[in-house]
């Protein structure tokens, strides 16, 4: 399924849950540094997303944190119970297979594509930071979609995922 079809399916799913969104179209971006000039005017929590696997390639995690967080994979591995040194970045092939998005497009909004293989880790600051909106790519890195933190959680749970909420402060 093409990115535009996946985005349309995402928008349909959000609509079915009565979730209102705000979308900003922008040039394709592959890094936070490239993205921020296009969306820094949007008030709220902007995301950085990491698609990770364990050393044995048996488990996958999508980790969503505030865009300016630095993540230590060893510390995160300990928090997730897989041990220090056991988390790795998953390759694009695995991300395409599990979440139907490629490099630069990792997003928790793609969790509706997952068959239950991916665990979702969410920075608690998205829910506890008093943000009016939280922002993610809508299946493409040429747009950014904002929704309320409450609606975001409703969407995530509707995909069958119970987020692992961690404090990254």
Swiss-Prot record:
Pfam families in UniProt: tRNA_edit (PF04073)
Residue ranges of the TM segments: none
Molecular functions (GO terms): aminoacyl-tRNA deacylase activity
Protein origin, superkingdom: Eukaryota
Protein family: Belongs to the PRORSD1 family.
Name used for this protein in its record: Prolyl-tRNA synthetase associated domain-containing protein 1
């Amino acid at each position: 399924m093409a990115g535009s079809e996946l985005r349309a399916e995402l928008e349909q799913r959000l609509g079915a849950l009565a979730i209102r969104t705000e979308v900003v179209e922008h040039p394709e971006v592959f890094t936070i540094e490239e993205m921020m000039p296009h969306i820094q005017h949007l008030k709220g929590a902007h995301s950085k997303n990491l698609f990770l696997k364990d050393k044995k390639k048996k488990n996958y995690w999508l980790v969503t944190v505030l865009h300016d967080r630095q993540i230590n994979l060893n510390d995160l591995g300990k928090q997730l119970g897989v041990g220090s040194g056991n988390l790795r970045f998953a390759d694009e092939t695995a991300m395409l297979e599990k979440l139907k998005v490629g490099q630069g497009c990792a997003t928790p909004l793609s969790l509706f594509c997952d068959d239950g293989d991916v665990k979702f880790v969410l920075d608690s600051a998205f829910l506890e930071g008093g943000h009016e909106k939280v922002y993610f790519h809508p299946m493409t890195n040429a747009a950014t979609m904002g929704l309320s933190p409450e609606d975001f959680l409703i969407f995530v749970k509707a995909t069958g995922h119970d987020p692992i909420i961690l404090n990254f402060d």
